[in-house]
Amino acid sequence: MKNIFIKLIAVFALLIFVLCGINQGETEAASKSANQDLIIINKHYNKLAYFHNGQIEIMEPVATGKTWEKTPVGFFKVVNKIKNRPYYNGNIPGGDSRNPLGKRWLGLNAKGTDGDIYGIHGNNNENSIGKYVSQGCVRMHNADVEKLYDQVQVGTPVAITYSYKSFVDLTKVYNYTLKDN
């Protein structure tokens, strides 16, 4: 009985160590980009902020998942960039005005995917922006996502959250250092 108790304590301690290491890794990843880039998407306000070299460069409205679980919360990276990506489910070619993905796609490695399931993209329904309507992606106005696409590099960290905090306060959560104006 004593051996079982000791093994349980060891497993519990290992579990705590592993979980703390995962969170520390996310914080360190954000910290390494502290003077470079960070995208924060706040599902509470349905807004996206892009920070570059300690300054906010872009802040725009977005659309996110129609239910809580559709757009994953967490810390991810941009893993691919595609102009005029086809909409495979509807067999709609890239560049077609019917394409719900719009003109630009920034693929995210959310939920262990390789950037082909979750992304930040344009749309074919400008009235959807600011609402909870997507199947999990983050939609932007086409002009806004084109501007973001031109500035963001593959590897840019992306934090998706649901928070009442301001973007300035959220940069502190992700250890991103803002420059004084």
Regions found by a protein language model. Give the residues of each.
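Exported/periplasmic cell-wall-interacting domains
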Residues: 30-34, 82-181
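Sec-dependent N-terminal signal peptides of Gram-positive bacterial secreted proteins and lipoproteins
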Residues: 2-26
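Cell wall/extracellular polymer interaction/catalysis modules
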Residues: 23-80, 84-85, 103-109, 173-176
